[in-house]
């Protein structure tokens, strides 16, 4: 069952094209990664899904309801964490958490206290005194303490240290085990690779790749290092081998995943002494699409 469904979303801001035909589908109990650099269209897509802005073209629904016309009804079942959290400066962190949780009709004080402890947050301090990381913690505690069916997280670990990132990841997996759905927008590829069932990569307002992590890994290459007692003739002519480099009798190269089995059989004929391989990573695919664009 599709919890989120977006079809052919288009959005312009003046002459700037923010979205150009975005399709997205997130199913029940799924963690869906939405990745791309800043300015690629992630936040614009999320704002359309939340009914904050209206798409110029296309359709978006959550729980089968229209994202724009039924936004109030949808929000009763959604927890949202933005990447840049702004809080009421005269309230304490604990007061803000209580406000958000009560607005959602939840009142699980044990869950609230457990999350405050996990995220190492002092809820008695005024929000004006919080660092960016602590403001992010307030938003995360408020979201995870709510009894939502869908969690939309836009760059949620921005400002968190590695230890708190791990706590965040544990909380996300806890939610998934409860059968809830999560849309995770991020540019931290290791985080997405660790957590997500499916991924979409967005670039300049267009989805350029989408699928499960296994499906996407087949689109990129395996790194391999070998050492043989016999010289391998014409290795650069072998189908599926790329970017050969040699240093201290060690050959390193890239291998097309679909050719991996045949390549191993071929090089094994030359008295292998050493073979190391590193499987394809999401980062490899991401960088293949973005290299040359001035970074991410």
Labelled PLM ranges:
Residues 2-6, 11-203, 209:
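ABC transporter nucleotide-binding domains
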Residues 222-296:
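Short, charged/small-residue-rich alpha-helical element at the C-terminal edge
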Residues 28, 93, 213, 279-282:
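Structural motif detector for alpha-helix initiation sites
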Residues 123, 179, 220, 268-271:
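Residues at helix C-cap/C′ positions in short coil/turn segments immediately following an alpha-helix
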Residues 1-2, 219:
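Extreme N-terminus of proteins, especially the signal/transit-peptide cleavage junction
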Residues 70, 212, 262:
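Short acidic active-site motifs
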Residues 168-254:
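ABC transporter nucleotide-binding domain
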